[in-house]
């Protein structure tokens, strides 16, 4: 099964400090170089962490890379291949692939559009919210039926983090 989830990973150049050599996630060889890269919770030779499309060495072109469908991609190739992340469920406008988003019940929102249907306050990562019949409610404005147990929310969420960039 191919994983279609997108992950943005920070690429960090670290010194090997003379410790035991690490194995490269790309070629499997020991990393004896003075500097190595740490990305996606693995160690890499600087020459081995490359974009699957353009073959650019990712440590040389920035500090982040994206993984999707088994590919490791630079930002430009990710945007070229996967374009936008769809339309915002609140405003209907397109969401660029590089923009952070919030999700609820399969719906995608711009960060600025992820607001309570009653008070219109923006909900941020860590806020509790309720998703009822396609509407988002903050903890304070949740429908009264939820308090008495008469209404079943489609989703009543614990604190939520924003999705990784894109998707």
Curated annotation (Swiss-Prot):
Composition bias, Polar residues: 1-17
Keywords, sorted A to Z: Developmental protein, Differentiation, Gastrulation, LIM domain, Metal-binding, Neurogenesis, Repeat, Transcription, Transcription regulation, Zinc
Record-annotated LIM zinc-binding domain positions: 22-84, 86-148
Disulfide cysteine pairs (residue numbers): none
InterPro entries membership: LMO_RBTN_TF (IPR050945), Znf_LIM (IPR001781)
One GO molecular-function entry: transcription coregulator activity
Keyword NAD: no
Gene Ontology terms describing biological process: cell differentiation; gastrulation; mesoderm development; negative regulation of neuron differentiation; nervous system development; positive regulation of transcription by RNA polymerase II
Residue segments, region Disordered: 1-20
Entry-linked Pfam families: LIM
Keyword Transcription: yes
PANTHER family named in the record: LD11652P (PTHR45787), LIM DOMAIN ONLY 4-RELATED (PTHR45787:SF8)
The name this protein goes by in its record: LIM domain transcription factor LMO4.1
Organism in which the protein naturally occurs: Xenopus tropicalis (Western clawed frog)
Gene: lmo4.1
């Amino acid at each position: 099964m191919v994983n279609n989830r997108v992950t943005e990973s920070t690429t960090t150049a670290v010194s090997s400090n003379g410790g035991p050599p690490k194995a490269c996630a790309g070629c499997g060889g020991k990393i004896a170089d003075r500097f190595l890269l740490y990305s996606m919770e693995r160690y890499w030779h600087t020459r081995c962490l490359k974009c699957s499309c353009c073959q650019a060495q990712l440590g040389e072109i920035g500090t982040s890379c994206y993984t999707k469908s088994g590919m490791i991609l630079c930002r430009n190739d990710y945007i070229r291949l996967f374009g936008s992340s769809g339309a915002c469920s609140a405003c209907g406008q397109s969401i660029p692939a590089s923009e952070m988003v919030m999700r609820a019940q399969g719906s995608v929102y711009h960060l600025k559009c992820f607001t309570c249907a009653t008070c219109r306050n923006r909900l941020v990562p860590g806020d509790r919210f309720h998703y009822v019949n396609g509407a988002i409610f903050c903890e304070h404005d949740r429908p009264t039926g939820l308090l008495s147990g008469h209404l079943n929310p489609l989703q009543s969420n614990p604190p939520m983090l924003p999705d990784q960039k894109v998707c």
